[in-house]
């Protein structure tokens, strides 16, 4: 189920189980994982397959392997808060994913996360090709970090 309220999403989580975050791009899907205490977000991997069945199967494998209790999906909206073509694509993907999982799904504003991830990697002297291979997973970890920080800030 897709949850629009962070407090409600948090109430549905199982204690001591991690979350995953997804940065759903047009060419790659970045995946990040939290620790069990919901304190740290870490880039996990990048899915380069564009077939949604394969993407969902890959995500289901990650969910099972890490015993994930919830999913955060980055929602791309424009700088003024409006809906874009990619917003609609991500919403359709979230709807499709919810048919395959019984976990709560939370959509988090992801404005500028991929750009921030690329700049972060660049600051370490990582070459463009390597940045492009990893920026979506790092962006997913930034999206997840936003949610984890909000949970901490609101003492959820």
Swiss-Prot record:
EC numbers on record: 3.1.-.-
Pfam families: RuvX
Cytoplasm found in the keyword field: yes
Family: Belongs to the YqgF nuclease family.
Any Gene Ontology biological process: rRNA 5'-end processing
Annotated protein name in UniProt: Putative pre-16S rRNA nuclease
Sorted UniProt keywords: Cytoplasm, Hydrolase, Nuclease, Ribosome biogenesis
Function: Could be a nuclease involved in processing of the 5'-end of pre-16S rRNA.
GO cellular component, one term: cytosol
Statement: the UniProt record of this protein carries the keyword Nuclease: yes
CDD domains per UniProt: YqgF (cd16964)
Cell compartment(s), UniProt: Cytoplasm
Gene Ontology molecular functions: nuclease activity
PANTHER family found in the cross-reference section: POLYNUCLEOTIDYL TRANSFERASE, RIBONUCLEASE H-LIKE SUPERFAMILY PROTEIN (PTHR33317:SF4)
Source organism (scientific name): Rickettsia typhi (strain ATCC VR-144 / Wilmington)
């Amino acid at each position: 189920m897709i949850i629009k309220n962070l407090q409600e999403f948090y109430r549905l989580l199982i204690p001591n189980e991690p979350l995953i975050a997804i940065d759903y791009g047009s060419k790659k899907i970045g995946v990040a994982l939290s620790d069990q205490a919901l304190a740290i977000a870490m880039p996990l991997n990048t899915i380069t397959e564009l077939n949604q069945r394969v993407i969902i199967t890959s995500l289901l494998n990650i969910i099972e392997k890490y015993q994930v209790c919830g999913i955060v999906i980055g929602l791309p909206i424009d700088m003024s808060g409006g809906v874009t073509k990619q917003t609609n694509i991500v919403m359709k993907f979230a709807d499709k994913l919810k048919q395959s999982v019984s976990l709560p799904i939370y959509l988090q504003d992801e404005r500028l996360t991929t750009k921030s991830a690329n700049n972060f990697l660049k600051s370490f002297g990582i070459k463009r090709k390597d940045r492009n291979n990893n920026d979506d997973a790092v962006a997913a970890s930034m999206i997840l970090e936003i949610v984890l920080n909000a949970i901490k800030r609101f003492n959820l």
